[in-house]
Amino acid sequence: MITFFISLAALVVGYLVYGSFVERVFSPDDRPTPAVAKADGMDYVAMPYWKVFMIQFLNIAGTGPIFGAIMGAKFGPAAYLWIVFGCIFAGAVHDYFTGMLSMRNGGCDLPELVRKYLGGGASKVLLAFAVFLLVMLGTVFVYSPAEILHGIWGSTTLWIVLIFAYYVVATMLPIDKIIGKVYPLFSFSLLFMAVALVAVLVVRMPQLPELWDGLGNMGKAASPSTFTDSIFPCLFITIACGAISGFHATQSPLMARCLRSERKGRPIFYGAMITEGLVALVWATVSMCFFYDAPQPGYEQIAGAADKGFLTSAPMVVNLVCKDWLGLLGGVLAMLGVVAAPITSGDTAFRSARLIIAQALRLNQCPKKNRLYICVPLFAASFAMLVWQMENPDGFNTIWQYFGWANQTLSVFALWTITVYLVRENKPYVITLIPALFMTTVCTTFLMVSNTAFGLPYSVGYAVGGMALCIAIVWFAVWKRNVSKKQI
C-alpha cells in the first residue's frame, strides 16, 4: 500500500507543479472565449466552472479508469508507474492543450486543429479515423450496458432500443439540457465510490506487491496460462483513460465551448485528467487485492474469467468489490459505474462525431434538420456495427481491442499536432515531443504483435516499433530544421 499512497501524492504534486508549468507554457489570457463570442444556445453555452469540470471528468472517464485499471492491474506495480507518469507528463498535457487550442481556435474539433498544424492530408485521415473511433465507442457502450441491465429486468433488445433512443435525444438536444443537468450527478457518484474504496483500503491495509518488489509482469509469473500479455506495449494500450487517451481529444473541445475564461483551463482540462488518474489508482489497487492478496472472495471466479476477456472479468471485479466491500450502497454505485458511466460516454461520443462531421461540412447545427442530416447516417452505421457485434460470439472483445489501439493512435495525432504548435510558437516543445515519440512506438509495436492485427512475434514487433521511432525522430528533425530556416 505504500506505493499506492506515494502514487496518490505524486499525482497531486504533479498537478500543482507540472500543471502550473504547462499552463505557463500556453499562457492563457483574458480574450473572449467561444462560449461568449459564439454563444448559440446549442453547443456554445457558457456554464458554471464546477459543472464544466464535472462534465469534463465524466466525459473523459466513463468506465475507462475503472475497467482499464482493473485489466492493467494484472501487470503488477508497473501499472502504478504508467498511471502516474503517463497522467502527469502525457495525458493531462494532451487534454489541456487540446482543450486550450480548441478554445483559441473558435471551439474547433481535433480534425480542424490537425488540418491547421499537420496539413490537409493528415486532417482527412484523422477525420475518418476519429468518426469511426467515436461510432465504435458508442456502439460498444450500447451493448455492454444492455447486457448488464438484461440481468436485472427486460430483454437485451429492449434495453438496446431504449439506450439508442436516449443517445439520439442527447445528441440532438442543446448541451445544457441533459448533459449539463445529469452528468454532474453521475460524476459525483464515481468520485464518491472512489473515496469510499480508499477508506476501505485504509481499514483493510492489504499486503500488495510494491515497486521495490520488481517491475516484471507479475500476472504472467502468477498465472502464465491466463495472463500472457507483455508489459510493453500491452500495458500502455490496456490502461488508456487512466494515463493518456486519444478519446479525450474529442471531448475537450466540447467543454472548450462552455468555458467563460481561458484561465480556468488548468483545473478543468489538466485537473480532470489528474482526477481520472486518481480514480484509476484506486481501482488498480483494489484489483491487486483480488489478484495478489489471496485469498479473496471471488478471486478464482475472476481468474477463471480473465481469459474470456473484458466483459466477464472487469465488471465482475466491480460487482464483487462493491457488494463485498460497500454493501447495498455499493451495489447502487456499481450500477452507476458499470451502466450509467458507459452510457454517458456513448452519448458524448456520438455528439462529438456529429460536431466533427458538421465542422468538416460547414453545416450550421442550430437548425434541427441539419442535426438530423448527420445523426441519421451516424446511428445507422452504429446499428449495423451493433448487429455484427451481437451475431459474432467474440464481437465485443474484437471491437474493444481495436478501439484500444485506435484510441491510443488518436492520441498520437493529437500529441504531434500540439508539438508542431509549440515549435511554431517558439515554446518548449519537448513536453509533448517525448510523449508523442513514446506513443508512436507503443501503437506501432502493438499493431505488429496483437493477435487482432498482424500477430507477429514480439521480437519482430519491437524491431518495427524501433524503426517507427527512428523514422519519427528523423522526420521531426528535418521538419524542425526547415521551420527554423523559414523563421530566420
Regions found by a protein language model. Give the residues of each.
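Extracellular loop-to-transmembrane helix junctions
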Residues: I2-G19, G72-S102, P111, G331, ...
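Selective recognition of specific alpha-helical transmembrane segments in multi-pass small-molecule
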Residues: F4-V17, A130, L134-G138, A170, ...
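Membrane-interface "cap" regions at the ends of multi-pass membrane proteins
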Residues: A10-I66, K264
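Helix-loop-helix module between adjacent transmembrane segments
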Residues: A10-L11, A90-G106, L110-P174, A240-I244, ...
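Hydrophobic, membrane-embedded alpha-helices of multi-pass small-molecule transporters
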Residues: M47-G64, V200-P206, N217-W283, L333-S345
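Loop-to-transmembrane helix boundary motifs in multi-pass membrane proteins
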Residues: G121-L127, V131, L158-V161, G271-A280, ...
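Hydrophobic alpha-helical segments and their helix-loop junctions in multi-pass secondary transporters
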Residues: G138-V142, A146-V161, A170-T171, L190-A221, ...
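Extracellular/periplasmic helix-exit of transmembrane alpha-helices
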Residues: V202-G214, G271-L320, M390-D394
